[in-house]
């Protein structure tokens, strides 16, 4: 390869890299997942997580519906945060009232993969089987999972560490998610 050709290829690489560099610094995208029929205690936790995410400049991703999703969205929206709801139905109006940006999928629970793939970290607050599927997807994709009163996993090998970072408060959940993103 001639030096002229090498210089041209190097220039193309630089241009391509520059083309994919965001103009603005993107806010971290953190998903909050959890059950639709949650206890008051879990709903308070979820609302606190949403509030903490907004205060720290993160975008909250959620399923956009009721329960933990709505509580987290409410907490985030009430302090001016951005809430993106990945809605399982094909209608934007199905999203809860606190969702800033509804993304309609018409995919039912299949939208769980979109929530997880779009997140840099996942905070699970409580959870039913849908939450369990999202946790499993995140772990398989090596996306950090922070657990606030959520599923506990058991393996045959007791020396293997828990793949979920366990916390007991909303602030600790957001701290752990931000740390996982920055590590």
Residue ranges and their predicted role:
Residues 80-88, 101-104, 144-148, 166-167:
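Short hydrophobic/aromatic-enriched beta-strand-loop microsegments
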Residues 34-37, 109-173:
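C-terminal binding/interaction regions
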Residues 86-122:
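Glycine-rich oxoanion-binding loops at beta->alpha junctions
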Residues 16-84:
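Glycine-rich beta-alpha loop segments
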Residues 65-66, 88-91, 150-153:
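Short, ordered loop/turn segments at secondary-structure junctions
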Residues 177-183:
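Short, hydrophobic alpha-helical segments
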């Amino acid at each position: 390869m001639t030096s002229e050709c090498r210089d041209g290829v190097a220039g193309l690489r630089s241009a391509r890299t520059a083309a994919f560099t965001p103009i603005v610094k993107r806010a971290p995208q953190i998903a909050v997942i959890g059950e639709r029929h949650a206890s008051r205690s879990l709903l308070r936790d979820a609302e606190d997580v949403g509030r903490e995410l907004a205060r720290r400049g993160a975008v909250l991703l959620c399923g956009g519906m009721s329960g933990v999703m709505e509580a987290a969205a409410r907490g985030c929206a009430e302090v001016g945060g951005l809430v993106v709801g990945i809605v399982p139905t094909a209608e934007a109006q199905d999203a809860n009232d606190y969702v800033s940006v509804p993304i309609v999928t018409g995919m039912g629970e299949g939208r769980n993969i979109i929530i997880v793939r779009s997140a840099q970290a996942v905070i699970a607050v409580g959870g039913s089987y849908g939450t369990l599927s999202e946790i499993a997807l995140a772990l398989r994709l090596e996306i950090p999972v922070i657990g606030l009163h959520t599923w506990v996993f058991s393996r045959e090998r007791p020396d293997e560490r828990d793949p979920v970072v366990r916390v007991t408060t909303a602030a600790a959940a957001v701290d752990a998610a931000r740390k996982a993103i920055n590590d």
